[in-house]
Amino acid sequence: MKRLAATIASLFLITASSAEAQQPNVAGRGLSPEDVRRVAPALEKYTRDRLDDEVWNRPGLTPRDRSLVTIAALIARELTLPMPYYFGQALDTGVKPGEISEVITHLAFYSGLGNAFAAVGPARDVFAQRGIGPDQVPQASPPLLPLNEAAEADRATRVGGQFGAVFPGVVQYTTDVLFRDLWLRPDLAPRDRSLVTISALIANGQVAQLTGHIPIGMNNGLTQGEIAEAITHLAFYVGWPNVFSAMPIAKDIFEKRAR
């Protein structure tokens, strides 16, 4: 029932802009399943029967992975009202506090600093309620994971050749900050970084970027089935149009890799 109420809150806010979602009269409006039944009983039924009871129990992704996909979508869309519930659920399904911290940090670069800072408050409150202290989140500058020099050299050459002459600053920061630093931070596995990146891109309708990030994700250990199931899961949180925009790109990548 708690997940149902939180899901209803998140689906309610998905239709609001980020600015609207921050207005007190919206952010403070709690919706119980009973509230929804009084207005849209079918909506409450779909949420309970299809999303809560069915989608979250599908075998294609673990509950932990579904939690990562969901919190990535909420951060990407700056939907702060349901975050406390879903951060708590993430902890309950096996996501570590340090991994939540790293998801927030990671998505600052893929969804914007403002979205990341908006998630800090809800995460702080959940951590406080759970007795999670600063010693359980990653340090600012940990020893980094080893870099795949060949793969990074190929990526840097391609991006530099396309954009380096016109946007040298973006190209340099992409190399120095993202792929030689952020992606190598050890407290969120590369596979999970890819999962939350792909989820955030789909949530924000930035599907052109999937041509790069789905192959990276598969190289990092995501399977075709897991990516397909993440897209299925996201349909309920970010809308069918966003996933239908992503599906042709994902399908094309899957087919090319199978050749």
Pin down the residues of each PLM region.
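Positively charged n-region of N-terminal signal peptides that target proteins for export
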Residues: 1-4
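Bacterial N-terminal signal peptides
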Residues: 7-16
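Acidic, glycine/proline-rich low-complexity segments that act as flexible tails and inter-domain linkers
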Residues: 21-65, 77, 84-88, 92, ...
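Short, structured motif recognition centered on aromatic/hydrophobic residues
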Residues: 66-74, 83, 103-104, 193-201, ...
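A short structural micro-motif
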Residues: 75, 93, 106-113, 202, ...
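Winged helix-turn-helix DNA-binding recognition segment
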Residues: 95-100
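Preference for long, well-ordered alpha-helical segments
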Residues: 115-116, 206, 226-245
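Glycine/small-residue-rich hydrophobic helix-like segments
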Residues: 204-224
